[in-house]
């Protein structure tokens, strides 16, 4: 079943606050093999001008993917998550994510396109502090395989 095009432009409510801790940053850095002391050593981070350790740039995926739950779990959209693959990811950082941040994410459906029998869902996650300071904009493409109707009646 094709995705509902009327969802283009939809914005979902902010996620609950996510507390960024040093340990979460360290674990993420270890998982992606980023050995920078800025992610592990508060003194190294302070010497570089940061108030505390900073997260690797891709740490934002934790927040953006969690925010995607609002879209994935929206029964009106009709997205069968068992058919979804992650197609693309981009980040635009306004400042580094750092230990002690309390962050919220608002997710938007920016586009839905049908191609070759698949639906391509473009999602934007705006990550801010709980006070509203912009931190990161994450854009993702989710591909729902075999859900779209080919406008020309053929699957390419």
UniProtKB/Swiss-Prot annotation:
HAMAP family: UPF0336 (MF_00799). This is UPF0336 protein SACE_6876. It holds the Pfam family FAS1_DH_region. InterPro entries: FAS1-like_DH_region (IPR039569), HadA-like (IPR016709), HotDog_dom_sf (IPR029069), UPF0336/Enoyl-CoA_hydratase (IPR050965). Residues 8-128 form the MaoC-like domain. One of its GO terms (biological process) is fatty acid biosynthetic process. Belongs to the UPF0336 family. One of its GO terms (molecular function) is (3R)-hydroxyacyl-[acyl-carrier-protein] dehydratase activity.
């Amino acid at each position: 079943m094709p995705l509902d095009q009327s969802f283009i432009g939809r914005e979902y409510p902010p996620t609950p606050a996510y507390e960024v801790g040093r340990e979460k940053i360290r674990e993420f850095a270890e998982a992606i093999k980023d050995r920078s002391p800025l992610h592990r050593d508060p003194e190294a981070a302070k010497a570089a001008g940061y108030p505390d350790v900073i997260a690797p740039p891709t740490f934002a995926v934790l927040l953006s993917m969690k925010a995607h739950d609002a879209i994935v779990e929206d029964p009106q959209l009709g997205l069968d998550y068992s058919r979804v693959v992650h197609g693309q990811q981009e980040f635009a950082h306004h400042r580094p994510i750092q230990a002690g941040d309390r962050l919220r994410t608002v997710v938007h459906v920016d586009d839905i396109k049908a191609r070759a029998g698949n639906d391509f869902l473009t999602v934007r996650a705006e990550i801010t502090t709980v006070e509203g300071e912009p931190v990161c904009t994450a854009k993702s493409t989710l591909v729902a395989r075999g859900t779209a109707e080919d406008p020309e009646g053929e699957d390419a």
